[in-house]
Amino acid sequence: MNANELDAVLQRDYEVDISKYFKKGWATLQPCFGPMVGFFLVIFLINVVLASIPVVGKIAPGVIYAPLSAGSTFVVLAILRGQSFEFKDFFKGLSNKYFLQLFLISLVGGLLTIVGVLFFLIPGIYLFVSYVFAVPFAVDWDLEFFQALEASRKLVSRQWLQVFVLLILIGLMNILGLLLLGVGIFVTAPLSICIIVCLYNDIAGNTLNSATEEA
């Protein structure tokens, strides 16, 4: 990681053009639509299987969910940078290089958000929105979990309200996906990831990093 380059990235001004990123997210999803939907089905099935196992089913999903779901970030970054990908790339988050940091991002970020919610709600909402880029920062800049959380918070804070509105609309889209007999979520959830990663990549993407090429 080049600390000076990252510091410069965190000082960038940017605007969140909601219409642009919904369109760009959809355009990015199309080349990987089948694999992406298949990956989310795999996540769903893994959670169903784990949930059926006594004791383990109460712990394992929480441990592996963040590293597993982060796989879509690797693939979307590869597509945006004109790189090829294989289905196995969806599971890069489970590798030794990334697993612990991604798990800690989920654990610590989640705990801080919950604490914020307990203190008058608003701090929790602020942190929930602020940490939206933590996973992309971790895998793209090889950051440790707290560095990734802080990098995301600093960047989002420059246009927090715009990012908040984007996430509200993404949330509404996913609610609509659930209302469509529950199956629509397998389209809206991958699209949500594409939208968020497209925005991240335009603002802070580390195009010199080979994370999207190496396990």
Role assignments for model-derived ranges:
Residues 16-46, 84-115, 127-178, 208, ...:
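Interfacial aromatic "cap" segments that immediately flank transmembrane helices
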